[in-house]
Amino acid sequence: MILIDDIKYACMECVRGHRSSSCKHHERPLLQVRSKGRPGVYANGNPNHRVAIFAEEIAKSDKPSTNGTKRCKSEPIIVLKASSKQVIDCSSGVIIGPYDETKTKPSTVEKRTPSPPIISDESFINTSACCTPKISKGKSCGCCNNKRKAVNKSKILQNYIKNKLNQKINNNETLVFMNKSHTTNNEQKEDHQLYGMVPVPSCSIPGTCCCDDACSCQGCVVHGNSKYQIPLPTSKQQVTDTTNPFENEEKFIFNSMPQTDKSDLFFNTISTSSNVPPADSSSECSCPPNACDCTNCETHGILNGFRLDDYFKDQSKLMNVLDFNFSELLGTIPEQPIPTEFMQPPSENTLLTSLSSENSFIPNQTKELSTQPPILPLDAQNVCNELDQLEPLVPSLQPCDKKATKWVNNRDTLEDVSDNRVKSCCSKKTK
């Protein structure tokens, strides 16, 4: 082993043969033995360049050696006085020049320091729940929060239509459906009679009085109270004035809703007869107007998940709300006003059914416009029934073409289903 200034050196051959500890070749160029691992610094930045020195003399020891041969074999340590450091090329053995430590460059293959982790150590520390901000739940309305609560769908539809009608009245918007003039036998009719709800006082219809035997209602038909007699119409003008609540409307079927308190009578009657528990009016919906998620919302007019505004875009649907069908929401209904000749006054049974029905929320004045097929006159139906009874008796006679076309098309005009045409068909068959 060769030590120079307490640094281990060996010749090039011993370094390559991994015999640096037993090297004694001091007459050769001696290379500095590096520590294990990759070198941190290269001489002149070149991996083939190594720092080398040349031995000049052997330093003499002060004490004489005893058993020198045995000691050298066991501990072959030689201390030399070397020359200055030189740079030698290991591949060729050529001395490049003196070694300059300032020109030494660090190794490019030096291990890089590991980058800090993306997730810091503090993120794994458990924090207290009181320090972390809590997510505050937004305010929800009563109809969205409590799903088990019974919803009064009748009240939702009732308030929606009532608000729509009041809005139309306040904005002075009128809806006009003009009657088309129909001629029979090339003659123009002078007047078109309109049939609607007769404004009769309460308790004048059988089944509407809820009093006991001591009833004191004026004109009560149920308990036979005759203190008040309802005047009956005696002239054609009085009948027209009674059946037509819209006076001086110039032959319009519907012009505008009258601003009277009679329309509130049906809303009060329905609200008292309904068996559905009333909804909580104190809890108002806090959803945005255009993004309400409620299934049944009275504030925004939503019924069974459908917006009533989308259904009642057509004004004829709003007027025909008595025929409201929940299973056919957002459906299309033909917009065609019905001629006044096919409109008949409602009977008492029909009026009672509309009052007791759960889905009837609008005064019967709005039922003047109906999209159902037109109803034939009663006398025309009777005559046609008689014709059907005569067919088995006279098999040779063929039915009239006018009768066949009359029953195929339900939307024929009055000319095809008039009394005169039907009676003429009867006279032909009986001859």
From Swiss-Prot:
Keywords: Activator, Copper, DNA-binding, Metal-binding, Nucleus, Transcription, Transcription regulation, Zinc. It holds the Pfam family Copper-fist. Zn(2+) binds at C11, C14, C23, H25. The keyword Signal does not apply. GO terms for cellular component: nucleus. It is found in: Nucleus. GO terms for molecular function: copper ion binding; DNA-binding transcription activator activity; DNA-binding transcription factor activity; DNA-binding transcription factor activity, RNA polymerase II-specific; RNA polymerase II cis-regulatory region sequence-specific DNA binding. SMART domains: Copper-fist, Cu_FIST. Disruption phenotype: Results in reduced growth on copper or iron depleted media and the inability to grow on media with a non-fermentable carbon source. GO terms for biological process: alternative respiration; filamentous growth of a population of unicellular organisms; intracellular copper ion homeostasis; intracellular iron ion homeostasis; positive regulation of transcription by RNA polymerase II. It comes from the Eukaryota. Copper ion-sensing transcription factor which activates transcription of the CTR1 copper transporter under low-copper conditions. Promotes filamentous and invasive growth. This is Metal-binding activator 1. The lineage of its organism: Eukaryota, Fungi, Dikarya, Ascomycota, Saccharomycotina. The gene is MAC1.
